[in-house]
Regions:
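Active-site acidic short loop of glycosyltransferases
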Residues: 2, 54-56, 79
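Short beta-strand element of the alpha/beta-hydrolase
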Residues: 3-10
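Active-site loop/oxyanion-hole signature of alpha/beta-hydrolase fold enzymes
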Residues: 11-61, 75
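Active-site micro-motifs of SAM-dependent methyltransferase domains
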Residues: 13, 67, 91
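Gly/Ala-rich beta-loop-alpha elbow adjacent to hydrolase catalytic centers
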Residues: 62-66, 70
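Flexible "cap/lid" loop of the alpha/beta hydrolase fold
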Residues: 75-76, 80-118, 122
Length: 124
């Protein structure tokens, strides 16, 4: 039986960011990409991903914002995660100011991606 891998993209990314990884990993694992575009908080994103995941247990990979969601999944359903990969994210807790900014960007991304891009570009 193939292992299950659940990939979580970053803010302003969708499944296409993992196209090549899905193609390569599909030879050895069942791979799916979580949709992080449908909720307004990290907690809600994690709940949505867990509800929609086809596998009961999986290796979880979080990229950027996906890493924050992965940590929330680890807090809420650790029994479902058999391995964790974090990329371009942080394990340090956000300050309350940083957390509020991130949550506002997630909420804004649901309605106005251009505005999110305008806010993030100067930070690059």
């Amino acid at each position: 039986m193939k292992p299950n891998i659940l990939l979580l993209p970053g803010l302003l990314n969708d499944a296409s960011v993992f196209t090549e990884q899905v193609a390569a990993l599909s030879a050895v694992a069942t791979v799916e990409v979580g949709d992080l575009s449908i909720a307004e908080s990290v907690t809600d994103l994690a709940a949505s991903v867990l509800k929609k995941a086809s596998a009961r247990c999986f290796v979880l990979l979080g990229l950027s914002l996906g890493g924050y969601v992965a940590f929330e999944i680890m807090r809420s359903a650790p029994e479902r995660v058999v391995g964790l990969v974090l990329m371009d994210t942080t394990a340090r807790p956000d300050t309350s100011e940083a957390s509020a900014k991130r949550e506002a960007l997630i909420k804004l991304a649901a309605t106005d991606l251009d505005a999110v891009t305008e806010q993030l570009l100067p930070l690059l």
